[in-house]
Amino acid sequence: MSDNDGLMLMNFTTESGPDNASSHRRVKVTGGKWKERRKLKMKLEGRPLRPKRPAAAVEEAPAAAVPEGSAIEPAAKRPRGRNERAPKDVPPQPANAQVVSSLFTSTRAITTSVNDHERASNDVAPSNAPLLQDTFEALGVRGTLLEHLTGKMKIQKPTKIQKMAIPEVLNGKADLFLHAQTGSGKTLAFLLPVLQTLLSLEQRIDRHSGCFAMIVTPTRELAAQIYGVISTLAQCCHYLVPCLLVGGERKKSEKARLRKGANFIVGTPGRMLDHLQNTKVAREQLPHSLRYLILDEGDKLMELGFEETLKSILEIVHSVACDNTRFPRLPQRIVHVLCSATRQGTVSKLGDIALTDPKVIAASDSTTDVSTVPDQLLQKIAIVPPKLRLVTLCAAISELSRKAPTETTTRTIVFISCADSVDFHYDVFSGLGGSHRDLVPGTVRELAAGSRALPCFSADSPPNTVFYKLHGSLPQAVRVATLRHFSSDAAATRGKHLVLFCTDVASRGLDLPRVSTVIEMDPPFAVEDHLHRIGRTARAGVAGESLLFLLPGEEEGYMEHIRAHHPRGWELLRYDRDLLAPAFAAPVARSDRPTTATDAAWDSNATTWHLNVERRVLEDPSAKDLAIKGYTSHIRAYATHISQEKRFFNVRCLHLGHLAKAFGLRERPKGMAAHRGKPATPKPKQDDARTKMLRMARQAVAQSNSEFNY
């Protein structure tokens, strides 16, 4: 046993003080509430509890002493504690206050002041006009079809693309790629030789003879237009029947028409592939009759993502061998025809897929692949600040309405980037003042006397203006009715100015009669879309105008980007001097109270008109909803420009507040985030294993006791 047995050695410290950390024992307390555990732990460790200061003491605490004569001022007292909540009876302050700003202040400077690509002269020869020295008879169109074409349809001379393409299609020995400007007559270039070939057959044909030609188009509107052209041409041979296959229609009715028989099938890719796969009669007649497969607007077919669908259609068509025993004078193979106004990009890829050793037929004499606009088209460009976009569009439409002749119908197309923005602009121009009547419910409105939509309207004369809207979100029947009304020359439209607000759904292939002006309020998503948009005017040798809106800054560089497509130049307009000042020279009445006409300046009249729109958006919940949807959709659409043009159209360079004013909104852009989508609904909580087992057991017992369980 050692000397230390039974002894305890202890070390004591003689130091004391509050700063000595060893004096506090670390104690672990478990159980109970957090506050109680905290108090008990501090008590056991010997640390004093800090007394809680009342709120009154905080407010009455003296401020820190400030030296006399110092420039530093004492900090202001806080009205309440940091964690103290506001009284419940005080209404919360709005997080998104309204901002009323002037139209003509704080706008971005326009750097382009001189037009370095001025249009030389307006006296130019049309580039897509009919050729006066040639005839259809010399091209091989004869007999009944020639008489109907020149007599009933009043088409006397062929265009350049028709002169070059009709003999090649009649020959039927090679695939063709037709390239020509918009409005040059590509549709008749492939329809006339197909009809002439059928009329020259020795055997009598009718609707039961089979389908001789399939025509694939990217949009329903273009398919309906080609169907109408075939129906008009077939009036001279009533036994030839076309059939239209597009989405939005009843497939049962289309199947019935196919069973009755059709010699021409026109449709969109998806619906046509559906019938080729699921309608037996559509495939049975292919070997004996099908000899022409035509792809119209090939670049748009690829742009809309129809590549795989077209491959499937071609695979089905090519899987059947041609049989010429019934019609020996038909071509020995299927002739493929690809039509497009552009030759670059994805259309060349489609040519590699669909065509075999094609022969390119181009109406242009240029050796380059750059597509150009018609020579007789007068292009105008206006650089407009974002706040002034709406009022400048009003000025442009007002001047067109004021100058429109009352003897003939004038048509104007306004291209906008998205469907929600189309709905907003249609509602503003057709609903401002409330004086209108619906010609087609929801899409066509005729303005009545008393309308304040345009500054050129007077109270003692009818406006003679009809507004339309068209986009892909409308039902198919409504789209067809709207387009038919816009194209008609009936009493409801004769002698009036027809204005169509639309998306790019109306930019491809549509041959709308006498479209005098095209306004691109939103720049196109690609240069090809720009060419097709302005191609709705200046068709078949007729003069036309186009107006393009650009924002100051980066978008001004877009003019250099499209310079090669406008070899004859353009006119550069000033938005204030050339557009706003002439249109708003007349006084504009306020919508909130009756006012007498005064000779105010044009900028005051423009401000009054825009304030009328803002008040309508502020007072009408439905109008405000349209404005917010149009604004947010416009921002999203602006961000979808192709990568090659992002340097001109960068969404980060937009002034969102100024752009919101162009939609009549006074809210800050951040405050409109709640309107961008439907409120999220919480997901239902999933049952655990036990609850799920009990629920299924109860369902089994209830089912066994049911009176229908025999």
UniProtKB/Swiss-Prot annotation:
Catalysed reaction equations from the record: ATP + H2O = ADP + phosphate + H(+)
Localization terms from the record: Nucleus, Nucleolus
Cellular component, GO, one term: nucleolus
Location of the motif Q motif: 134-163
UniProt keyword terms in alphabetical order: ATP-binding, Helicase, Hydrolase, Nucleotide-binding, Nucleus, Ribosome biogenesis, RNA-binding, rRNA processing
UniProt signal peptide: none
SUPFAM superfamilies for the chain: P-loop containing nucleoside triphosphate hydrolases (SSF52540)
Region of interest: Disordered: 1-97, 669-690
Low complexity bias locations: 54-68
EC number: 3.6.4.13
Protein name: ATP-dependent RNA helicase DBP7
Gene source species: Eremothecium gossypii (strain ATCC 10895 / CBS 109.51 / FGSC 9923 / NRRL Y-1056) (Yeast)
